[in-house]
């Protein structure tokens, strides 16, 4: 997939060719087509270690490692009461876009609107009473829920957002 998150940025990730079609160049064709559509943009890549040499041949370099963390929603502790956590719909959308843009690579209102309003999706904000101090969203998967985007001013706010979000979810909750 290639997702254009803003006018200047796109992310590439997760393309898999079925085993019976591997070795015929289909993966490379998909890769070249995806990169060609976004020539001139800054590209981010969700990469698998086994393909790092392939990605490097196209100019990508590893910036950091990534790990997935998962837990059953019901096994997480309760959130702190009165932590200033509200549904994201409780603030004007332009404020949410501005907060997200300050933590991403720029504004992405169309992506954000779709991301937080799709079926089964949930999103929360943290507020100090005057401004947004955190934002988290979840989406359903075949096996549970994925968390992201997820931005917070500090670890306490992040913890409260995650735990509050988990109270409305069932099954595994994953973040990576």
Question: Which functions belong to the PLM regions below?
Answer:
Residues 40-49, 61-75:
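Conserved catalytic-core motifs of GNAT/GCN5-like acyltransferases
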Residues 54-60:
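Conserved active-site tyrosine of GNAT-family acetyltransferases
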Residues 48, 57, 150:
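Surface loops and adjacent helix of pleckstrin homology
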Residues 72-90:
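Conserved N-terminal entry element of GNAT/NAT acetyltransferase domains
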Residues 4-13, 18-24, 29-43, 52-53, ...:
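Intrinsically disordered, low-complexity, positively biased terminal segments
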Residues 61-63, 80, 142:
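A generic fold-level signal
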Residues 65, 81, 147:
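Glycine-rich, flexible loop/turn motifs
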């Amino acid at each position: 997939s290639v997702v254009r998150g803003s006018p200047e940025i796109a992310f590439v990730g997760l393309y898999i060719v079925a085993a019976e079609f591997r070795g015929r160049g289909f993966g490379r064709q998909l890769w070249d087509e995806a990169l060609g559509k976004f020539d001139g943009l800054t590209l981010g890549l969700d990469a698998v270690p086994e393909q790092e040499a392939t990605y490097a041949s196209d100019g990508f370099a590893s910036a950091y490692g990534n790990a997935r963390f998962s837990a059953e929603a019901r096994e997480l502790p309760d959130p702190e009461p009165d932590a200033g956590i509200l549904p994201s719909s409780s603030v004007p959308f332009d404020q949410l876009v501005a907060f997200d843009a300050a933590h991403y690579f720029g504004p992405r209102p169309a992506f954000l609107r779709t991301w937080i309003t799709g079926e089964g999706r949930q999103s929360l904000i943290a507020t100090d009473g005057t401004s947004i101090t955190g934002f988290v969203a979840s989406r359903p998967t075949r096996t549970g829920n994925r968390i992201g985007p997820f931005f917070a001013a500090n670890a306490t706010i992040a913890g409260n957002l995650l735990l509050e979000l988990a109270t409305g979810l069932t099954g595994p909750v994953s973040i990576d």
